[in-house]
């Protein structure tokens, strides 16, 4: 059964935390478990099929995944929807997940990690700092960073794309929530300049735009 963003109902509150900058809750019913931030669903998991994707922008990401990936980096994994999906698709792949919010990583481990899959390596770090310090090479990077009203400024500046160019030899997929056409144009220009050929794909009915870039250098 699909997770309906307009009609879901919770039977249990599994976790609640509130800070000045955000409120986190994890809820569950007989079929699904989900993570809400300030009342907005950020991740959703089927209890019987943890690898399924439910949120509106995620099929667009799944359609643009490469045929194969063995070294995956997730910047801003949230509740790990794509981490679980990729773990089922490529069981032998090595997966690193980076998040600035330590609580998000802890909640992923406690409530959203699929025990049947190879465990990802979790890193509590700033995304740009992690990239600058990393000595690893990746063939797939998923970039899904957000702030209260969209994406952080970082996604519209050159340094993160320059850092990605150094460690990426394959596919970059970015989940954008552009506030203006100028933000979208800026992110696409930077991805094309530093990564390679880039295409933008809107999600009907939502702000999300998925950027797909390829670096084969």
PLM regions and their residue ranges:
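Conserved beta-strand signature within the Rossmann-like core of class I S-adenosyl-L-methionine
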Residues: 169-176
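Rossmann-like AdoMet
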Residues: 1-69, 88
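The AdoMet/dcAdoMet-binding core of the Class I SAM-like
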Residues: 3, 52-166, 180-182, 204-206, ...
């Amino acid at each position: 059964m699909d997770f309906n963003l307009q009609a879901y109902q919770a039977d249990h509150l599994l976790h609640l935390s509130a800070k000045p900058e955000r409120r986190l809750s994890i809820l569950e019913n007989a079929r699904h478990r989900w993570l809400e931030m300030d009342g907005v669903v950020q991740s959703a998991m089927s209890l019987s099929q943890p690898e399924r994707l439910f949120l509106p922008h995620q099929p667009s990401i799944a359609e643009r995944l490469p045929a194969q990936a063995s070294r995956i980096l997730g910047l801003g994994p949230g509740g790990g929807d794509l981490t679980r999906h990729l773990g089922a698709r490529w069981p032998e792949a090595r997966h690193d997940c980076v998040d600035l919010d330590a609580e998000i990583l802890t909640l992923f481990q406690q409530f959203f990690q699929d025990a049947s899959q190879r465990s990802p390596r979790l890193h509590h770090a700033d995304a740009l700092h992690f990239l600058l310090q990393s000595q690893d090479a990746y063939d797939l990077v998923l970039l899904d960073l957000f702030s209260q009203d969209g994406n952080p400024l970082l996604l519209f500046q050159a340094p993160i794309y320059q850092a990605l160019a150094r460690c990426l030899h394959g596919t970059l997929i970015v989940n954008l929530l552009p506030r203006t056409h100028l933000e979208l144009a800026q992110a696409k220009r930077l991805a094309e300049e530093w990564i390679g050929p880039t295409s933008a794909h809107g999600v009907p009915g939502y702000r999300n735009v998925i950027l797909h870039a390829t670096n084969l250098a």
